[in-house]
């Protein structure tokens, strides 16, 4: 049976479809209770189109196969312009090689364009540079970070 995929915004029921476990393939998630998930989901939803999480669901199994998010930053630069920040793009290891990551990035970039953003940016590992170049992005700067434990 052929796999079919549907891209859409995150729904509250997606926790039961492996959403948190999928994020665990990207980085540390910790244990997120249903109550914590529901609270964070409602908080993010309250931001409307300024914070969007998309998922790709494999329709036969109902599992979340890929995800990514974007936050819209409102600036004073560029005539009070907006910039999109893509984060947390991950494709389940079982579904890699099917262009799902590219579909997630395109979905998020399309959202940024529809919101009137003048640019979209993201941070990625050196290993993922070629993937993002294939999505139409180019190396612009160096990322700096400081983690607070």
UniProtKB/Swiss-Prot annotation:
Substrate binds at residues 27, 75-78, 87-89, 118-119. Keywords: Acyltransferase, Endoplasmic reticulum, Membrane, Transferase. Optimum pH is 7.0-8.0. SUPFAM superfamilies: Acyl-CoA N-acyltransferases (Nat). Expressed in roots, leaves, stems, cauline leaves, flowers and siliques. Acetyl-CoA binds at residues 97-102, 132-134. One of its GO terms (molecular function) is glucosamine 6-phosphate N-acetyltransferase activity. Changing residue 68 to S: In lig; reduces activity 2-fold. Retarded growth. GO terms for biological process: N-acetylglucosamine metabolic process; UDP-N-acetylglucosamine biosynthetic process. Residues 5-149 form the N-acetyltransferase domain. Pfam families: Acetyltransf_1. It is a peripheral membrane protein. GO terms for cellular component: endoplasmic reticulum; endoplasmic reticulum membrane. Its EC number is 2.3.1.4. InterPro entries: Acyl_CoA_acyltransferase (IPR016181), GNAT_dom (IPR000182), GNPNAT1-like (IPR039143). Disruption phenotype: Retarded vegetative growth, delayed flowering and short and thick inflorescence stems and siliques. Acetyltransferase involved in UDP-N-acetylglucosamine (UDP-GlcNAc) biosynthesis. UDP-GlcNAc is an essential metabolite that serves as an initial sugar donor for N-glycan synthesis and thus plays an important role in protein and lipid glycosylation. Homodimer. The mutant lignescens (lig) was originally isolated as a temperature-sensitive mutant that exhibits ectopic lignin deposition and growth defects under high-temperature conditions. Belongs to the acetyltransferase family. GNA1 subfamily. This is Glucosamine 6-phosphate N-acetyltransferase. The gene is GNA1.
């Amino acid at each position: 049976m052929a796999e079919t995929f549907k891209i859409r915004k995150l729904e509250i029921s997606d926790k039961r479809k492996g959403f948190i476990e999928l994020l665990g393939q990207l980085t540390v998630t910790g244990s997120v209770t249903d109550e914590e998930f529901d609270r964070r989901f409602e908080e993010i939803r309250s931001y409307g189109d300024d914070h969007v999480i998309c998922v790709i669901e494999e329709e036969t199994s109902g599992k979340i196969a890929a995800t990514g998010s974007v936050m819209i930053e409102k600036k004073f630069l560029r005539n009070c312009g907006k910039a999109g920040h893509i984060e947390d793009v991950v494709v389940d290891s079982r579904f890699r090689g099917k262009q799902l990551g590219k579909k997630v990035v395109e979905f998020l970039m399309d959202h940024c364009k529809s919101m009137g953003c003048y640019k979209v940016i993201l941070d990625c590992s050196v290993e993922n540079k070629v993937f993002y170049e294939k999505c139409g992005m180019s190396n612009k700067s160096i990322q700096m970070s400081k983690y607070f434990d």
